[in-house]
A protein has these predicted regions:
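A short, N-terminal "cap"/entry segment at the start of jelly-roll beta-barrel domains
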Residues: 1-38, 53
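Conserved short histidine dyad/triad with adjacent acidic residue
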Residues: 27, 42-57
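A generic "binding-loop/recognition-motif" signal
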Residues: 48, 59-60, 78, 94-95, ...
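Short beta-strand segments in beta-sandwich/barrel cores
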Residues: 51-52, 69-74
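Glycine- and acidic-residue-biased ligand/ion/polar-headgroup-sensing regions
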Residues: 59-61, 65-71
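Ligand-binding loop in jelly-roll beta-barrel domains
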Residues: 72, 92-116
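Short acidic-glycine-tyrosine-enriched beta hairpin
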Residues: 78-92
């Protein structure tokens, strides 16, 4: 299955999970297209100072992969600075957040996968 960039759904969301700013999302595939293999697959852009607030994963897990820039990712209270190519996976029963602490945009891939 192919999905061209100009066919992808986009959204701007405000203060996600209590975070700051209005991150933008480009959904690579819909949940229906993914057939239950993933609940969400999106490239998210955080402008300087923007964040996705701390949130739990209770019936799924979420992976972040930094594609451009850098971000501070906090999992279960432990903060790490991630750079291009670095990744984090928040499993069921854990919490995480992501914040662009830099002066340049940060782009990351976010994939939410259901528990099996």
């Amino acid at each position: 299955m192919f999905q061209m960039k100009d066919e992808m759904q986009t959204a701007v969301k405000h203060n996600i999970r209590g975070g700051e700013g209005s991150p933008s999302f480009r959904y690579l595939f819909s949940a229906e297209q993914l057939g239950g293999r993933a609940e969400m697959m999106a490239v998210t852009t955080l402008q300087p100072g923007e964040s996705v607030g701390v949130h739990p994963h209770e019936t799924n897990g979420e992976a972040y992969v930094i594609l451009e820039g850098a971000a501070t990712v906090t999992e279960d209270g432990q903060a790490r600075e991630l750079h291009i190519g670095d990744a984090e996976f928040c499993a069921d029963g854990h919490t995480h957040s992501i914040r662009n602490h830099t002066a340049a945009p940060t782009r990351f891939l976010a994939v939410i996968v259901p528990n099996k």
